[in-house]
């Protein structure tokens, strides 16, 4: 445990230029303080000691703003920068030398028992406010953008952004935003179906022979061609990330 804590301590000076000296890190870095408490709580948890590990985790959350379940397995050299609002669930696994920013959630989905939280390989960076949910695998050297919501496995050496998370770089090469072979966009497909249905209903409405009304009602519809162009443009903007 002490070797792991030493790696946690050293990595701060490598990754944070604001770290001036060891005393400052010990007293003013809540992320490191949370890791110290977690290392102790996790050891007690492994000894199957009741209540005390959870109590220590709870006190750590009150002190640092970081909530790490004592059952979570964290590698060495982890840096939780700023810390406030970080939540790491019971069955989460975090590899060596990962960087986690404030507001990150490594959470579960559903109420099932067993492995239900994500697994992060080595050297993963999770940006501020990102959510990684469910029993998914995040490969080595992955970068997850701030505010992203990741719900599926991510291969190594990728950059993921957006809601839901999409791979935009793979091994340093930008991925075509319209290529959904890796991460299909179900929301875009639903919107496409709805727009097609609206267009069909409008065509049916144009073909109706309505009886004359006492007062004229303006039911002028845009030409079909204009509606198709609007639909296609809207879909393309959505697929390219508009509104995310």
Curated annotation (Swiss-Prot):
Keywords of this entry: Acyltransferase, Amino-acid biosynthesis, Cysteine biosynthesis, Cytoplasm, Repeat, Transferase
GO cellular component: carboxysome; cytoplasm
Source superkingdom: Bacteria
A GO molecular function held by the record: structural constituent of carboxysome shell
GO biological process, one term: cysteine biosynthetic process from serine
InterPro entries tied to this protein: Hexapep, Hexapep_transf_CS, LbH_SAT, Ser_AcTrfase_N_sf, Ser_O-AcTrfase, Serine_acetyltransferase, Trimer_LpxA-like_sf
Annotated compartments: Cytoplasm
Catalyses which reaction(s): L-serine + acetyl-CoA = O-acetyl-L-serine + CoA
Keyword Lyase carried by entry: no
Main EC class the enzyme belongs to: transferase
UniProt similarity note: Belongs to the transferase hexapeptide repeat family.
Protein name, entry field: Serine acetyltransferase
Gene name of the record: cysE
């Amino acid at each position: 445990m002490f070797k792991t804590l030493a790696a946690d301590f050293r990595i701060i000076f490598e990754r944070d230029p604001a770290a001036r000296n060891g005393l400052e890190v010990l007293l003013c870095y809540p992320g490191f303080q949370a890791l110290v408490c977690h290392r102790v709580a996790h050891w007690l948890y492994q000894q199957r000691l009741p209540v005390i590990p959870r109590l220590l985790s709870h006190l750590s959350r009150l002190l640092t703003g970081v909530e790490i379940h004592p059952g979570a397995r964290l590698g060495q050299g982890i840096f939780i920068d700023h810390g406030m609002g970080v939540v790491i669930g019971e069955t989460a696994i975090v590899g060596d030398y990962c960087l986690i920013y404030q507001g990150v959630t490594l959470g579960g989905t559903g109420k099932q028992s067993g492995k239900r939280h994500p697994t992060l390989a080595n050297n993963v960076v999770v940006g501020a406010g990102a959510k990684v949910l469910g029993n998914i695998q995040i490969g080595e050297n992955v970068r997850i953008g701030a505010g992203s919501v990741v719900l599926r496995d991510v291969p190594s050496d990728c950059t993921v952004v957006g809601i839901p998370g999409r791979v935009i770089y793979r091994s340093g090469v930008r991925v075509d935003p319209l290529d959904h072979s890796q991460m299909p966009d179900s929301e875009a497909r639903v919107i496409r179906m709805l727009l097609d249905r609206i267009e069909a209903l409008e065509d049916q409405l144009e073909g109706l022979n309505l009886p004359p009304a006492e007062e004229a009602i303006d039911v002028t519809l845009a030409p079909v061609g204009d509606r198709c162009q609007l639909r296609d443009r809207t879909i393309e903007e959505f697929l390219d990330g508009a509104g995310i």
